[in-house]
Design a protein with these regions (language model features):
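Outer-membrane beta-barrel porins/channels
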Residues: 19-30, 37-41, 58-61, 66-271
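Alpha-helix capping/hinge segments and adjacent helical runs
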Residues: 34-36, 42, 47-53
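A ubiquitous, low-specificity "background" feature that marks scattered single residues
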Residues: 8-9, 55, 170
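Sec-dependent N-terminal signal peptides
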Residues: 4-14
Length: 271
């Protein structure tokens, strides 16, 4: 644990701001690509763009762990389950940020469907809850997110996603703690089976546009190298992925110039 760094963050940002409600992205592959992931179909599409679930033809599940700035109290754990059926694809997700007296939970139920060979859409109902000493009496709240993916061909994919358009939030003793709406749009191009380049822009209320880019390449079969950059402030990301039969394992690292390294790992299964 990095107690001095945690104390410093609390002093600079304050408890309420540091632990403000947030929709945390998950998946070590996504983190390694600087979360430029709005157009990518993946086990963790339940946290990025539910439209990506429509591209799944088989059951998939994953578990994820992240240690923000290598501080145990700021850890993030998550799980995702994808179940294709005749009518479309269901997704179930859960995440928990924090540890000890502070915990922030998100539960999601998603449904996605291919509207045509090129257009895919998805929607997810979310329930957020948060607990720490200053808001022990706070209640959770429900919201939703929805997205679309368009693929004019087998190499180019374009995606758009909006989270919490109703700007819901938790009622506390100090008033309503709102959660910002987030809009993301971007795309990726698969040059061949070895190279993928992804670009995304994100807009959150009262904050500047955030540009995110990532590149993934396979020097050999089943082994992926990933790099990304986003800002401002500038964050650099990198990671590896390895697949063996029906299991893939990814590790990702994000580096913040002032706050340090955030390591992550995820494991995905397909049946």
């Amino acid at each position: 644990m990095k107690r001095p760094l945690l104390t410093f963050l609390l002093f600079i940002f304050g408890l309420s701001k540091l632990f403000a409600l947030e929709n945390h992205p998950t998946g070590a592959r996504s983190l390694a690509l600087s979360n430029a992931f709005v157009s990518i179909s993946d086990t963790w599409s339940t946290f990025h763009n539910q439209a990506g679930l429509a591209l799944f033809k088989q059951f998939s599940a994953g578990v994820y762990y992240e240690s923000k700035f290598a501080i145990e109290e700021l850890s993030l754990t998550a799980s995702s389950l994808i179940l294709p059926v005749n009518a479309g694809t269901f997704g179930f997700s859960f995440s928990q940020f924090g540890k000890g007296s502070f915990k922030e939970n998100k539960v999601g139920l998603a449904f996605a469907k291919s509207l045509s060979e090129k257009i895919h859409a998805g929607i997810q109902l979310d329930y957020f809850s948060q607990r720490f000493p200053e808001n022990s009496n706070a209640f959770g709240f429900a919201t939703f997110e929805t997205g679309i993916i368009y693929s004019p061909n087998k190499k180019l994919f374009l995606g758009a996603h909006i989270f919490n358009p109703i700007s819901g939030g938790i009622e506390t003793n100090e008033g309503k703690q709102k959660m910002s709406a987030i809009f993301r749009v971007g795309g990726h191009y698969q040059f061949d089976e070895m190279i993928l380049i992804s670009v995304e822009t994100q807009k959150e209320a009262e904050t500047p546009f955030l540009i995110k880019t990532g590149i993934e390449f396979y020097p050999v079969q089943n082994l992926a190298f990933r790099f990304g950059v986003s800002g401002k402030p500038v964050n650099y990301t990198t990671g590896l992925g390895y697949g063996f039969r029906k299991v893939t394992t990814d590790i990702g690292f994000s580096y913040h110039g002032n706050l340090g390294l955030t390591p992550s790992i995820s494991v995905q299964f397909k049946l």
